[in-house]
Amino acid sequence: MYKIRRGLGFFGFTLLVIVLFSACANNVSRNLTSSAELLPSQCRIVKHIMGETCVPINPQRIIAASDSTLEAALILGLKPTGTTTYAQQSDYLRERFESTASVGLDSRLLSLEKILTIKPDLILATDDYGEQQELYNRLSQISPTVIAKWWDGKNIRWKECFQLFAQAFGKTSEAEKIVNAYNQRIAELQQRMGDRLQNTLISIIEIYPDRIRLFGKTKTVSLSSTIIEDIGLPRPPSQEEGMDISLESIGDADGDIIFLMARDPEAQLYQQVMNHPLWKQLKAVQAGKIYKVENSYWGGSGYIAANLVLDDLFKYLLK
């Protein structure tokens, strides 16, 4: 008898769990459907890597699910309702807005529960990890979602992403002014450098706690290396493609000027590089042309960071 009662009890408990789960699932499904529906007159069509999305004309509750989407929103005068923890850790962005709701660590670890709580009317994301289909399938059930292609296999596409985000925000006129101002600064720097422009080899290096990275023209690139390319400054032959190098290959980091980023200046590897005989033999080191720059914006993701990089370039290249 005891065994029969226990079996019935277990069956009843299981049935209760199924009923509750189904009720919750139906409730979430209703929330998802109602959140994603928009009348054609209330939205604009935006084309992106996952197809076309009808986004609201004047979005009020925006989820910026990456640092590049957050940066685009901020420079265009918008404050997202939610973003990732990772995006909020960028010093140069954190200075420009008050804390906002976190919807997960990064685009791979988004909390759908937190996003549902915000009830967004627009979600922007990038395919940072090549998982755009899964990402889109999840997010587009909640709200109109636009996903930009960040990496094309050789370079980051920060400018193209910005244009797409501006279109989604309905801020294309403002975006054009930002792009024009950037291009004007590039032209000014080119003009002021004169003949030095074609005769100054620029090296970009970052020392992590566990590796040394050269940022090249393709493959392992950063926002700063694309800006150097925009200006037309030459790179050392060893930096056509970015890569990680060993301490014994530190000679590949040489140039007329070295811009140096360091994740942790107290780390053992950083100290080893600074004290290594091969480092001390570099032309830029001997000429005193090593300039330490901030990795947060030299490795940034939009026009806020780009202008901070240009500030550094005006400062150091026109000495």
Language model segments and positions:
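A short, structured surface patch at a secondary-structure boundary
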Residues: 66-114, 127-128
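Proline-aspartate-enriched helix->loop->beta-strand connector
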Residues: 116-125, 144, 250, 254-258
